[in-house]
Protein backbone atom coordinates (compact mmCIF):
# COMPACT_ATOMS: atom_id res chain seq x y z
CA UNK A 1 0.00 0.00 0.00
CA UNK A 2 2.84 2.33 0.79
CA UNK A 3 4.60 1.63 -2.51
CA UNK A 4 1.37 2.40 -4.30
CA UNK A 5 0.98 5.75 -2.54
CA UNK A 6 4.48 6.93 -3.44
CA UNK A 7 4.05 5.94 -7.09
CA UNK A 8 6.26 2.84 -7.27
CA UNK A 9 3.38 0.52 -8.08
CA UNK A 10 0.36 0.73 -10.33
CA UNK A 11 -3.22 0.20 -9.32
CA UNK A 12 -2.99 -3.58 -9.86
CA UNK A 13 -0.05 -3.84 -7.38
CA UNK A 14 2.65 -4.37 -10.05
CA UNK A 15 6.03 -2.73 -9.65
CA UNK A 16 5.73 0.04 -12.19
CA UNK A 17 9.33 1.17 -12.02
CA UNK A 18 10.51 -2.22 -13.49
CA UNK A 19 8.21 -2.68 -16.50
CA UNK A 20 10.63 -1.25 -19.06
CA UNK A 21 11.40 -4.11 -21.54
CA UNK A 22 14.65 -2.68 -22.85
CA UNK A 23 16.58 -3.84 -19.81
CA UNK A 24 17.81 -7.38 -19.30
CA UNK A 25 17.35 -9.07 -15.92
CA UNK A 26 20.31 -9.06 -13.63
CA UNK A 27 21.79 -12.08 -11.99
CA UNK A 28 22.46 -10.21 -8.75
CA UNK A 29 19.93 -9.51 -6.00
CA UNK A 30 18.56 -5.97 -5.60
CA UNK A 31 17.17 -5.07 -2.19
CA UNK A 32 13.98 -3.00 -2.18
CA UNK A 33 12.91 -1.18 0.95
CA UNK A 34 9.32 -0.01 1.24
CA UNK A 35 8.49 2.51 3.98
CA UNK A 36 4.99 2.99 5.35
CA UNK A 37 3.84 6.60 4.99
CA UNK A 38 2.36 8.17 8.05
CA UNK A 39 1.88 11.66 6.69
CA UNK A 40 2.33 13.30 3.27
CA UNK A 41 2.08 17.01 2.52
CA UNK A 42 2.35 16.87 -1.27
CA UNK A 43 -0.62 18.59 -2.89
CA UNK A 44 0.49 17.72 -6.41
CA UNK A 45 -0.74 14.65 -8.25
CA UNK A 46 1.79 11.99 -9.14
CA UNK A 47 1.93 11.51 -12.90
CA UNK A 48 2.84 8.15 -14.55
CA UNK A 49 6.56 8.91 -15.07
CA UNK A 50 7.27 11.83 -12.71
CA UNK A 51 7.67 11.91 -8.98
CA UNK A 52 7.19 15.12 -7.04
CA UNK A 53 8.81 16.06 -3.78
CA UNK A 54 7.78 13.75 -1.04
CA UNK A 55 8.17 14.10 2.70
CA UNK A 56 8.30 10.70 4.25
CA UNK A 57 8.40 9.73 7.86
CA UNK A 58 10.35 6.53 8.10
CA UNK A 59 8.93 3.75 10.23
CA UNK A 60 10.08 0.14 10.71
CA UNK A 61 11.85 -1.27 7.63
CA UNK A 62 10.81 -4.34 5.64
CA UNK A 63 13.39 -5.66 3.14
CA UNK A 64 12.20 -7.56 0.08
CA UNK A 65 14.97 -9.14 -2.00
CA UNK A 66 13.89 -10.37 -5.44
CA UNK A 67 15.48 -10.23 -8.92
CA UNK A 68 13.54 -7.74 -11.07
CA UNK A 69 14.14 -5.44 -14.04
CA UNK A 70 15.78 -2.07 -13.63
CA UNK A 71 13.88 1.06 -14.59
CA UNK A 72 14.92 4.46 -15.83
CA UNK A 73 12.09 6.43 -14.28
CA UNK A 74 11.26 7.31 -10.72
CA UNK A 75 13.30 6.98 -7.57
CA UNK A 76 14.04 3.53 -6.16
CA UNK A 77 16.05 2.17 -3.30
CA UNK A 78 18.66 -0.34 -4.30
CA UNK A 79 21.46 -1.92 -2.36
CA UNK A 80 24.21 -4.46 -2.83
CA UNK A 81 23.32 -7.99 -1.72
CA UNK A 82 26.53 -7.98 0.31
CA UNK A 83 25.86 -4.69 2.23
CA UNK A 84 22.67 -4.27 4.24
CA UNK A 85 22.62 -0.43 4.00
CA UNK A 86 20.23 0.80 1.28
CA UNK A 87 20.97 3.86 -0.85
CA UNK A 88 18.69 6.28 -2.70
CA UNK A 89 19.30 6.30 -6.47
CA UNK A 90 17.38 8.67 -8.74
CA UNK A 91 16.66 8.34 -12.45
CA UNK A 92 19.76 10.23 -13.52
CA UNK A 93 21.96 8.28 -11.14
CA UNK A 94 20.79 4.96 -12.56
CA UNK A 95 21.45 6.09 -16.12
CA UNK A 96 24.93 7.24 -15.22
CA UNK A 97 25.72 4.09 -13.27
CA UNK A 98 24.52 1.56 -15.79
CA UNK A 99 25.74 3.32 -18.90
CA UNK A 100 23.30 1.53 -21.25
CA UNK A 101 21.46 2.98 -24.22
CA UNK A 102 18.10 1.89 -25.71
CA UNK A 103 18.59 -1.22 -27.86
CA UNK A 104 21.74 -2.33 -26.05
CA UNK A 105 21.20 -5.85 -24.66
CA UNK A 106 24.40 -6.03 -22.66
CA UNK A 107 24.14 -5.54 -18.96
CA UNK A 108 26.22 -3.02 -17.11
CA UNK A 109 29.66 -4.22 -16.12
CA UNK A 110 29.06 -2.88 -12.63
CA UNK A 111 26.41 -5.51 -11.96
CA UNK A 112 28.49 -8.52 -13.15
CA UNK A 113 29.43 -10.87 -10.37
CA UNK A 114 33.19 -10.62 -10.03
CA UNK A 115 33.40 -13.90 -8.11
CA UNK A 116 31.81 -15.77 -11.01
CA UNK A 117 34.31 -14.41 -13.55
CA UNK A 118 37.25 -15.26 -11.31
CA UNK A 119 36.03 -18.82 -10.81
CA UNK A 120 35.56 -19.18 -14.57
CA UNK A 121 39.10 -18.02 -15.25
CA UNK A 122 40.38 -20.40 -12.59
CA UNK A 123 38.48 -23.28 -14.16
CA UNK A 124 39.86 -22.36 -17.60
CA UNK A 125 43.40 -22.40 -16.26
CA UNK A 126 42.91 -25.79 -14.67
CA UNK A 127 41.45 -27.16 -17.86
CA UNK A 128 44.39 -26.02 -19.93
CA UNK A 129 46.81 -27.49 -17.41
CA UNK A 130 45.06 -30.83 -16.93
CA UNK A 131 43.37 -31.44 -20.27
CA UNK A 132 43.38 -34.30 -22.72
CA UNK A 133 46.93 -33.51 -23.85
CA UNK A 134 48.23 -33.68 -20.28
CA UNK A 135 46.53 -36.99 -19.54
CA UNK A 136 47.61 -38.43 -22.88
CA UNK A 137 51.23 -37.76 -21.94
CA UNK A 138 50.74 -39.34 -18.51
CA UNK A 139 48.97 -42.40 -19.94
CA UNK A 140 51.64 -42.76 -22.63
CA UNK A 141 54.39 -42.76 -19.99
CA UNK A 142 52.53 -45.32 -17.87
CA UNK A 143 51.94 -47.77 -20.73
CA UNK A 144 55.50 -47.35 -22.07
CA UNK A 145 57.00 -48.08 -18.67
CA UNK A 146 54.81 -51.14 -18.02
CA UNK A 147 54.80 -52.59 -21.54
CA UNK A 148 51.59 -54.53 -20.91
CA UNK A 149 48.86 -53.16 -18.66
CA UNK A 150 45.11 -52.54 -18.46
CA UNK A 151 42.76 -49.57 -18.34
CA UNK A 152 41.90 -50.05 -14.66
CA UNK A 153 45.56 -50.26 -13.66
CA UNK A 154 46.49 -47.02 -15.44
CA UNK A 155 43.38 -45.20 -14.20
CA UNK A 156 43.89 -46.30 -10.58
CA UNK A 157 47.51 -45.11 -10.56
CA UNK A 158 46.62 -41.71 -12.04
CA UNK A 159 43.73 -41.28 -9.60
CA UNK A 160 46.11 -42.09 -6.75
CA UNK A 161 48.67 -39.57 -8.02
CA UNK A 162 46.26 -36.67 -8.55
CA UNK A 163 44.32 -37.22 -5.35
CA UNK A 164 47.34 -37.87 -3.15
CA UNK A 165 47.66 -35.31 -0.41
CA UNK A 166 51.44 -35.37 -0.69
CA UNK A 167 51.27 -34.20 -4.28
CA UNK A 168 52.16 -30.51 -4.61
CA UNK A 169 49.02 -29.41 -6.41
CA UNK A 170 46.78 -26.44 -5.75
CA UNK A 171 43.69 -27.07 -3.67
CA UNK A 172 41.33 -25.92 -6.44
CA UNK A 173 42.96 -28.15 -9.12
CA UNK A 174 42.01 -31.52 -7.61
CA UNK A 175 40.09 -33.77 -9.98
CA UNK A 176 37.40 -36.20 -9.03
CA UNK A 177 37.93 -39.84 -9.91
CA UNK A 178 35.22 -39.92 -12.55
CA UNK A 179 36.80 -37.06 -14.50
CA UNK A 180 40.27 -38.64 -14.35
CA UNK A 181 38.99 -42.02 -15.52
CA UNK A 182 37.15 -40.37 -18.40
CA UNK A 183 40.32 -38.55 -19.45
CA UNK A 184 42.32 -41.79 -19.27
CA UNK A 185 39.72 -43.50 -21.45
CA UNK A 186 39.92 -40.70 -24.05
CA UNK A 187 43.73 -40.72 -23.98
CA UNK A 188 43.86 -44.48 -24.58
CA UNK A 189 41.57 -44.12 -27.58
CA UNK A 190 43.80 -41.38 -29.02
CA UNK A 191 46.98 -43.45 -28.54
CA UNK A 192 45.30 -46.50 -30.04
CA UNK A 193 44.17 -44.48 -33.09
CA UNK A 194 47.78 -43.32 -33.59
CA UNK A 195 48.96 -46.96 -33.46
CA UNK A 196 51.13 -46.19 -30.44
CA UNK A 197 49.39 -48.83 -28.33
CA UNK A 198 47.28 -51.88 -29.10
CA UNK A 199 44.30 -53.22 -27.19
CA UNK A 200 43.10 -56.81 -27.15
CA UNK A 201 40.10 -57.32 -24.85
CA UNK A 202 41.27 -55.75 -21.57
CA UNK A 203 45.01 -56.01 -22.27
CA UNK A 204 46.86 -52.91 -23.48
CA UNK A 205 50.30 -53.32 -25.06
CA UNK A 206 52.92 -50.73 -25.96
CA UNK A 207 53.86 -50.62 -29.67
CA UNK A 208 56.09 -47.55 -29.93
CA UNK A 209 56.15 -43.92 -30.93
CA UNK A 210 56.09 -42.99 -34.62
CA UNK A 211 59.58 -42.64 -36.09
CA UNK A 212 61.05 -40.81 -39.04
CA UNK A 213 61.40 -42.32 -42.51
CA UNK A 214 65.11 -43.18 -42.24
CA UNK A 215 64.74 -45.08 -39.01
CA UNK A 216 61.59 -46.77 -40.26
CA UNK A 217 63.40 -47.86 -43.42
CA UNK A 218 66.26 -49.27 -41.35
CA UNK A 219 63.83 -51.19 -39.16
CA UNK A 220 62.10 -52.59 -42.23
CA UNK A 221 65.44 -53.76 -43.66
CA UNK A 222 66.24 -55.56 -40.40
CA UNK A 223 62.81 -57.16 -40.39
CA UNK A 224 63.26 -58.13 -44.03
CA UNK A 225 66.56 -59.93 -43.35
CA UNK A 226 65.06 -61.68 -40.35
CA UNK A 227 62.18 -63.00 -42.43
CA UNK A 228 64.51 -64.12 -45.22
CA UNK A 229 66.52 -66.17 -42.73
CA UNK A 230 63.33 -67.66 -41.37
CA UNK A 231 62.21 -68.63 -44.87
CA UNK A 232 65.56 -70.36 -45.43
CA UNK A 233 65.16 -72.34 -42.21
CA UNK A 234 61.63 -73.37 -43.16
CA UNK A 235 62.81 -74.48 -46.59
CA UNK A 236 65.59 -76.57 -45.06
CA UNK A 237 63.11 -78.25 -42.72
CA UNK A 238 60.71 -78.92 -45.59
CA UNK A 239 63.50 -80.40 -47.71
CA UNK A 240 64.59 -82.70 -44.87
CA UNK A 241 61.05 -83.97 -44.29
CA UNK A 242 60.48 -84.62 -48.00
CA UNK A 243 63.77 -86.51 -48.31
CA UNK A 244 62.89 -88.63 -45.27
CA UNK A 245 59.54 -89.56 -46.76
CA UNK A 246 61.09 -90.44 -50.11
CA UNK A 247 63.86 -92.51 -48.45
CA UNK A 248 61.45 -94.44 -46.23
CA UNK A 249 59.01 -95.22 -49.03
CA UNK A 250 61.82 -96.20 -51.36
CA UNK A 251 63.21 -98.52 -48.66
CA UNK A 252 59.80 -100.12 -48.19
CA UNK A 253 59.50 -100.79 -51.92
CA UNK A 254 62.99 -102.31 -52.03
CA UNK A 255 62.30 -104.61 -49.06
CA UNK A 256 59.03 -105.69 -50.64
CA UNK A 257 60.81 -106.59 -53.86
CA UNK A 258 63.47 -108.55 -51.91
CA UNK A 259 60.79 -110.52 -50.11
CA UNK A 260 59.15 -111.40 -53.43
CA UNK A 261 62.47 -112.52 -54.89
CA UNK A 262 63.52 -114.54 -51.82
CA UNK A 263 60.00 -115.82 -51.27
CA UNK A 264 60.03 -114.81 -47.64
CA UNK A 265 61.33 -112.32 -45.10
CA UNK A 266 65.07 -112.13 -44.43
CA UNK A 267 66.72 -113.62 -41.35
CA UNK A 268 66.50 -111.61 -38.14
CA UNK A 269 70.27 -111.38 -37.74
CA UNK A 270 70.55 -109.80 -41.19
CA UNK A 271 68.16 -106.88 -40.58
CA UNK A 272 68.46 -103.59 -38.72
CA UNK A 273 65.33 -102.09 -37.22
CA UNK A 274 64.52 -98.41 -37.61
CA UNK A 275 65.38 -96.04 -36.08
CA UNK A 276 69.09 -96.49 -35.40
CA UNK A 277 72.34 -94.54 -35.15
CA UNK A 278 75.83 -95.39 -36.35
CA UNK A 279 78.98 -94.20 -34.58
CA UNK A 280 82.08 -93.92 -36.75
CA UNK A 281 85.62 -93.46 -35.43
CA UNK A 282 89.20 -94.53 -36.04
CA UNK A 283 90.31 -98.11 -35.50
CA UNK A 284 92.91 -96.93 -32.97
CA UNK A 285 90.32 -95.14 -30.83
CA UNK A 286 89.79 -96.58 -27.35
CA UNK A 287 86.05 -96.82 -26.61
CA UNK A 288 84.59 -97.27 -23.14
CA UNK A 289 80.91 -98.23 -23.31
CA UNK A 290 78.59 -98.51 -20.30
CA UNK A 291 75.06 -99.92 -20.66
CA UNK A 292 72.22 -99.58 -18.16
CA UNK A 293 70.48 -102.66 -16.78
CA UNK A 294 67.34 -102.03 -18.85
CA UNK A 295 69.50 -101.40 -21.95
CA UNK A 296 67.85 -98.04 -22.63
CA UNK A 297 70.89 -95.88 -21.81
CA UNK A 298 74.39 -96.11 -23.27
CA UNK A 299 77.43 -94.13 -22.18
CA UNK A 300 80.38 -93.87 -24.58
CA UNK A 301 83.80 -92.46 -23.80
CA UNK A 302 86.19 -91.86 -26.72
CA UNK A 303 89.83 -90.84 -26.63
CA UNK A 304 89.65 -89.65 -30.23
CA UNK A 305 87.25 -87.87 -32.57
CA UNK A 306 84.13 -89.70 -33.74
CA UNK A 307 81.05 -89.21 -35.94
CA UNK A 308 77.39 -90.03 -35.30
CA UNK A 309 75.02 -90.75 -38.20
CA UNK A 310 71.30 -91.31 -37.92
CA UNK A 311 69.21 -93.64 -40.04
CA UNK A 312 68.20 -90.91 -42.52
CA UNK A 313 71.81 -90.08 -43.26
CA UNK A 314 72.55 -93.76 -43.82
CA UNK A 315 69.58 -94.11 -46.18
CA UNK A 316 70.75 -91.07 -48.16
CA UNK A 317 74.21 -92.59 -48.57
CA UNK A 318 72.56 -95.79 -49.72
CA UNK A 319 70.86 -93.80 -52.51
CA UNK A 320 67.35 -94.12 -51.14
CA UNK A 321 66.72 -90.38 -51.74
CA UNK A 322 67.73 -90.63 -55.45
CA UNK A 323 70.49 -88.04 -54.94
CA UNK A 324 68.02 -85.13 -54.62
CA UNK A 325 69.98 -83.47 -51.79
CA UNK A 326 73.10 -83.17 -53.98
CA UNK A 327 71.32 -82.18 -57.18
CA UNK A 328 72.37 -85.38 -58.98
CA UNK A 329 68.98 -86.83 -59.81
CA UNK A 330 68.14 -88.29 -63.21
CA UNK A 331 64.82 -87.67 -64.94
CA UNK A 332 63.65 -91.23 -64.24
CA UNK A 333 64.55 -90.97 -60.55
CA UNK A 334 62.91 -87.53 -60.36
CA UNK A 335 59.70 -88.94 -61.79
CA UNK A 336 59.84 -91.83 -59.32
CA UNK A 337 60.51 -89.47 -56.41
CA UNK A 338 57.46 -87.35 -57.34
CA UNK A 339 55.30 -90.46 -57.20
CA UNK A 340 56.31 -90.99 -53.57
CA UNK A 341 55.01 -87.62 -52.29
CA UNK A 342 51.56 -86.00 -52.36
CA UNK A 343 50.65 -84.29 -55.60
CA UNK A 344 50.57 -80.86 -53.93
CA UNK A 345 54.28 -81.20 -53.06
CA UNK A 346 55.59 -82.35 -56.44
CA UNK A 347 56.68 -78.81 -57.31
CA UNK A 348 59.01 -78.73 -54.33
CA UNK A 349 60.66 -81.98 -55.46
CA UNK A 350 61.57 -80.26 -58.72
CA UNK A 351 63.06 -77.35 -56.78
CA UNK A 352 65.04 -79.63 -54.46
CA UNK A 353 66.51 -81.49 -57.44
CA UNK A 354 68.37 -78.30 -58.42
CA UNK A 355 70.67 -78.70 -55.39
CA UNK A 356 71.45 -76.61 -52.28
CA UNK A 357 70.92 -73.39 -54.26
CA UNK A 358 67.18 -73.98 -53.87
CA UNK A 359 67.34 -72.63 -50.31
CA UNK A 360 68.23 -69.15 -51.63
CA UNK A 361 66.12 -69.31 -54.75
CA UNK A 362 63.71 -66.38 -55.09
CA UNK A 363 65.10 -64.55 -52.05
CA UNK A 364 67.77 -62.45 -53.79
CA UNK A 365 66.93 -58.88 -54.72
CA UNK A 366 67.98 -59.34 -58.36
CA UNK A 367 65.92 -62.48 -58.81
CA UNK A 368 62.43 -61.66 -60.08
CA UNK A 369 61.84 -64.78 -62.13
CA UNK A 370 59.73 -66.38 -59.43
CA UNK A 371 57.25 -63.50 -59.40
CA UNK A 372 57.24 -62.58 -63.06
CA UNK A 373 54.26 -64.84 -63.62
CA UNK A 374 52.44 -63.97 -60.39
CA UNK A 375 49.42 -61.68 -60.42
CA UNK A 376 50.12 -59.35 -57.50
CA UNK A 377 46.68 -57.75 -57.48
CA UNK A 378 44.85 -61.03 -56.84
CA UNK A 379 47.66 -63.19 -55.47
CA UNK A 380 46.87 -65.90 -58.07
CA UNK A 381 49.35 -67.63 -60.36
CA UNK A 382 48.99 -67.04 -64.08
CA UNK A 383 48.45 -70.25 -66.08
CA UNK A 384 51.85 -70.89 -67.63
CA UNK A 385 53.39 -74.32 -67.90
CA UNK A 386 56.93 -73.06 -67.36
CA UNK A 387 56.20 -71.95 -63.79
CA UNK A 388 56.07 -74.72 -61.22
CA UNK A 389 54.01 -74.64 -58.08
CA UNK A 390 56.91 -74.57 -55.64
CA UNK A 391 58.36 -71.36 -57.06
CA UNK A 392 54.97 -69.67 -57.03
CA UNK A 393 54.40 -70.51 -53.39
CA UNK A 394 57.85 -69.18 -52.54
CA UNK A 395 57.06 -66.01 -54.46
CA UNK A 396 53.92 -65.50 -52.42
CA UNK A 397 55.88 -65.83 -49.19
CA UNK A 398 58.53 -63.43 -50.45
CA UNK A 399 55.88 -61.00 -51.64
CA UNK A 400 54.38 -60.94 -48.16
CA UNK A 401 57.69 -59.60 -46.87
CA UNK A 402 57.70 -56.80 -49.45
CA UNK A 403 60.74 -58.11 -51.32
CA UNK A 404 59.55 -58.06 -54.92
CA UNK A 405 57.90 -55.70 -57.33
CA UNK A 406 56.42 -56.70 -60.65
CA UNK A 407 58.55 -55.17 -63.41
CA UNK A 408 55.60 -54.18 -65.62
CA UNK A 409 52.91 -53.45 -63.06
CA UNK A 410 52.58 -49.91 -61.75
CA UNK A 411 49.54 -50.85 -59.73
CA UNK A 412 51.38 -53.61 -57.89
CA UNK A 413 54.26 -51.21 -57.20
CA UNK A 414 51.93 -48.76 -55.50
CA UNK A 415 50.27 -51.58 -53.58
CA UNK A 416 53.60 -52.92 -52.30
CA UNK A 417 54.77 -49.47 -51.29
CA UNK A 418 51.49 -48.92 -49.49
CA UNK A 419 52.04 -52.08 -47.44
CA UNK A 420 55.43 -50.84 -46.22
CA UNK A 421 54.18 -47.36 -45.46
CA UNK A 422 55.69 -45.66 -42.46
CA UNK A 423 53.58 -45.20 -39.37
CA UNK A 424 55.04 -41.77 -39.02
CA UNK A 425 52.47 -40.46 -41.51
CA UNK A 426 49.66 -41.01 -39.02
CA UNK A 427 48.20 -37.60 -38.14
CA UNK A 428 49.35 -36.91 -34.62
CA UNK A 429 48.61 -33.17 -34.28
CA UNK A 430 45.44 -31.83 -32.77
CA UNK A 431 43.65 -28.54 -33.13
CA UNK A 432 43.58 -26.54 -29.93
CA UNK A 433 40.00 -25.46 -30.52
CA UNK A 434 38.87 -29.03 -31.07
CA UNK A 435 40.70 -30.07 -27.93
CA UNK A 436 38.95 -27.40 -25.89
CA UNK A 437 35.59 -28.47 -27.30
CA UNK A 438 36.29 -32.05 -26.31
CA UNK A 439 37.27 -31.00 -22.83
CA UNK A 440 34.10 -28.96 -22.38
CA UNK A 441 32.00 -32.01 -23.21
CA UNK A 442 31.01 -33.46 -19.85
CA UNK A 443 29.50 -36.68 -21.18
CA UNK A 444 31.39 -39.77 -20.12
CA UNK A 445 32.40 -42.23 -22.89
CA UNK A 446 31.77 -45.07 -20.52
UniProtKB/Swiss-Prot annotation:
Residues 229-261 are annotated as: DCB1. Residues 409-446 are annotated as: Disordered. It comes from the Eukaryota. It is found in: Nucleus. The keyword Transcription applies. Keywords: Acetylation, Activator, Cell cycle, DNA-binding, Nucleus, Phosphoprotein, Transcription, Transcription regulation. Residues 219-292 are annotated as: Dimerization. A motif (DEF box) lies at residues 176-210. Residues 274-330 are annotated as: DCB2. One of its GO terms (biological process) is negative regulation of DNA-templated transcription. Can stimulate E2F-dependent transcription. Binds DNA cooperatively with E2F family members through the E2 recognition site, 5'-TTTC[CG]CGC-3', found in the promoter region of a number of genes whose products are involved in cell cycle regulation or in DNA replication. The TFDP2:E2F complex functions in the control of cell-cycle progression from G1 to S phase. The E2F1:DP complex appears to mediate both cell proliferation and apoptosis. Blocks adipocyte differentiation by repressing CEBPA binding to its target gene promoters. This is Transcription factor Dp-2. It comes from Homo sapiens. The gene is TFDP2.
